[in-house]
Amino acid sequence: MKNFSLWCDFIENSFLDNEFLNLLSHGINGATSNPAIFKNAILNSPIYKDKILKLKEKKTKDIYEELAISDIQKAADKLAPLFYQKNDGFISIEIDPRLHDNTTLSLGEAKRLYSAIGKENIMIKIPATKASYEVMYELMKNGISVNATLIFSLEQSQKCFEALNAGLVEFRKNNIALKEQNTRTPQAVISIFVSRFDRLLNPKAKEQNRIGILNANLAYNNIYSKNEPNIRALFASTGVKGDDLPKDYYIKELLFENSVNTAPLDAIEAFKGKMHFKKPLMNFEIYTELNQIISQSEREKACNDLLSDGLEQFCIAFEDILKAL
C-alpha cells in the first residue's frame, strides 16, 4: 500500500534482540514507547535488575533515563536501515509527562533527550496540550522529528498540524542548501488515539466500536488534505480488550494511505498477511454516522476527559517507575 507504515507499540531490552528482529523482517517499519510501556518493561523484566544495581548511586530519574535511552538507542540502531533506505524506521520516546503544562521545561527536556540519544531516527513524543504546541514548533524548526501524542479531538489535530508545519516551513527556510548540507528534513506524526473512545462511549452509543474509528477517520482526513508528506496521521491505542473484536480490528479499519498504525504485539500477529486498503469515509459521511450514534456534546466531553485521563495515566506510570527505582 502507498505509504502505509505499521509500527510496534512495545519496547523491552531483550525483545529488541529477538522478536523485534523477526517483526522487522515481516514488514514492521518503526516502534513507539511511552511511560506505561517502560514501566512494564523495567519493573517486570529481570534483564534490568543488574543495570539498576550498578546505577543505584544516581538519582531515580537519571536511572530511568539511562535505562530508557539505552533501549531507545538499541531500537534506533535496529531500525536505522529503514530510516536511511526508506525514510521510515523511527522510534519514539516521550518527555517527562509531568511537564505537559510547562512549555520551557518541556522544550529543554526534549532537546536534552534528543542530544543524549544521539540518533537521527528518533521522534520526541510531546503530548498535545496548550503548552506543547510551541514545543512542537521549536523542535521541527530545529530539525528534530516529533510524535505529537494524546490526540483525541479534531481541534487538537489541527493545532498540532499548524505547529508542526510552521516549524517545518522555518526549517526549510533556514536550510535552503539542504541537499548540499546533507541535512535530513524532520518528520512528524500526529498520534490519534482510537480504542479508548470506544471503551469510554460504548455504553452510551447506539452502535458499538465505531466512534473511535470515525473520530480517527475525521482527524486523518484533516491531516491528509494538507498534502504534507512529512506530517502523517498515526493511529494509536489500537489494541483490543476482550474477545468481542478481532485483535487487528483497529488496524484493518484504518488502513489508509500515507498513515501509520502503531499496534500491540497481539494485533500485529493477527494482522499478518491482511494488507487490504481501506477507503476513508468523507467528512459528511462521518458526521452523518456519528450523529446517529451519539451526541456531539458527549463526543466533546469524551475528548476532554480522555486527554485528562491519558495525561494522568502517563504521569502515574512515570511516578511508579521512579518510586520503584
UniProtKB/Swiss-Prot annotation:
Transaldolase is important for the balance of metabolites in the pentose-phosphate pathway. CDD domains: Transaldolase_like. This is Transaldolase. InterPro entries: Aldolase_TIM, TAL/FSA, Transaldolase_2, Transaldolase_AS. One of its GO terms (molecular function) is transaldolase activity. The active site is at residue 125. Keywords: Cytoplasm, Pentose shunt, Schiff base, Transferase. Belongs to the transaldolase family. Type 2 subfamily. The keyword Amino-acid biosynthesis does not apply. It catalyses: D-sedoheptulose 7-phosphate + D-glyceraldehyde 3-phosphate = D-erythrose 4-phosphate + beta-D-fructose 6-phosphate.
